[in-house]
UniProtKB/Swiss-Prot annotation:
Task performed by this protein: Allows the formation of correctly charged Asn-tRNA(Asn) or Gln-tRNA(Gln) through the transamidation of misacylated Asp-tRNA(Asn) or Glu-tRNA(Gln) in organisms which lack either or both of asparaginyl-tRNA or glutaminyl-tRNA synthetases. The reaction takes place in the presence of glutamine and ATP through an activated phospho-Asp-tRNA(Asn) or phospho-Glu-tRNA(Gln).
A molecular function GO annotation: ATP binding
Top-level taxonomy: Bacteria, Pseudomonadati, Pseudomonadota, Betaproteobacteria, Burkholderiales
Entry's family note: Belongs to the GatC family.
Catalytic activity: L-glutamyl-tRNA(Gln) + L-glutamine + ATP + H2O = L-glutaminyl-tRNA(Gln) + L-glutamate + ADP + phosphate + H(+); L-aspartyl-tRNA(Asn) + L-glutamine + ATP + H2O = L-asparaginyl-tRNA(Asn) + L-glutamate + ADP + phosphate + 2 H(+)
Subunit structure, interactors included: Heterotrimer of A, B and C subunits.
Gene name, Swiss-Prot/TrEMBL: gatC
Name of the protein in its database record: Aspartyl/glutamyl-tRNA(Asn/Gln) amidotransferase subunit C
Length: 99
């Protein structure tokens, strides 16, 4: 899949990004290189290959030392709701604005 310069300019327009012609051409080259890489990766036959949870272990016989999942923040809902004018069951109460 290759993009044309008009595609890049249209995408920039839709994203409300102002680009010069030089920037658009540079972006076009980068995007086409990226799409070329994706096409190369999609062409590789990966049948029979198991996905790796930790790819580093496939290169070296090591295990990654991952930290334990631990709660680092306490529940401060009450502290945050204390200055609110009105709360109920942990929710902020606001005036009705749509009838």
């Amino acid at each position: 899949m290759a993009l044309a310069l008009s595609d890049v300019k249209r995408i920039a327009h839709l994203a409300r990004i102002e680009t010069s012609d030089a920037e658009a051409e540079q972006t076009l080259a980068q995007l086409n290189n990226f799409f070329s890489l994706v096409e190369q990766m999609q062409a590789v036959d990966t049948t029979g290959i198991e996905p790796l949870a930790h790819p580093l272990s496939a290169v070296r016989d090591i295990a990654q030392r991952l930290r334990e999942d631990a709660v680092t923040e306490s529940d401060r809902r009450a502290d945050y709701q204390r200055p609110a004018p009105a709360t109920e069951n942990g929710l902020y109460l606001v005036p009705k604005v749509i009838e």
